[in-house]
Amino acid sequence: MTYKLVLLRHGQSAWNKTNQFTGWVDVPLTEQGEAEAKRGGELLKEKNVLPDIVFTSLLRRAINTANIALDAADRLWIPVQRDWRLNERHYGALQGKNKTEIREEYGDEKFMLWRRSYATPPPEIDPNDQYAQNNDPRYAGDPVPEAECLANVVERVKPYFESAIEPELKAGKTVLIAAHGNSLRAIVKMLDNLSEEEIAKVNIPTAIPLLYELDENFKPIKPRGEYLDPEAAAAGAAAVAAQGQK
C-alpha cells in the first residue's frame, strides 16, 4: 500500500514581491501568485495527481492558492480543512521588515540565524505592534506565538499531521496540503527525517506541487519527493535561497 501526499506552497504574495518578512500577517497573492497557483493546479491535472481532500492554513495566500489550484484541476468540490497549525512560521518583530534592510542592519550571520536556524527564533513582536495577531478573531482560544523558530513550527505541525492528515492518507485519499514555506519545510523534515543542517538547505518554491509517495510506514519511497515541474522548481528554490541578498 502506498499513499500520495502533495505539498503546495502558496503563490507569490504581495510581501514576497516586496521582499518583506511575512509570517502570520495576512497578505494577498499578487497577480503573478494567482497565475502560479493556476499553473500548479494545471500540473496536478496534467500529471493525474488529483487530490481528494485539501488541508490549508488560516491565511488567505494559502487558502486562495488552494482554491485557484483546485479550480484549475477541476477539484474545487473536494473537502477543505483549515487550521492555524499549518500557518507560516511567526517571524516575530521581523514581520513587515524588508529582508535586505535587516541583513544590512544586523549582518549576514544574524540574518541567516534568524532566517534559517532551526532552534533560534527572531526577536519577539510587541503585542501592540500593527503586525501582531493577539486580537485577531480567527485565533480566539488558540495560542498566538510572539516569534517562532522552525523547531516551534515542527512542534505544532507534527501532532496536527498525525491526528488530522495521516488518517486521510490511511483511508487511501490523495491529500493536498496548501501552506507555507516553513510549515511545509517542517513536514519535509518529518517525512525525510532530515537533520537540522539538512533542513536549513531546503527551499520550497512557490506553487509547484511536490509529490510524496509514502510506504505503509509513511516513509518516502523517493527521498525528498518529486516536483511535478522539476526545472521550474529548481529555479524557484534558488530564488527563495537568494532572498535578502543585495
Curated annotation (Swiss-Prot):
GO terms for molecular function: phosphoglycerate mutase activity. Signal peptide: none annotated. It comes from the Bacteria. InterPro entries: His_Pase_superF_clade-1, His_PPase_superfam, PG/BPGM_mutase_AS, Phosphogly_mut1. One of its GO terms (biological process) is gluconeogenesis. NCBIfam families: pgm_1, PRK14115.1, PRK14120.1. This is 2,3-bisphosphoglycerate-dependent phosphoglycerate mutase. It comes from Bifidobacterium longum (strain NCC 2705). The lineage of its organism: Bacteria, Bacillati, Actinomycetota, Actinomycetes, Bifidobacteriales.
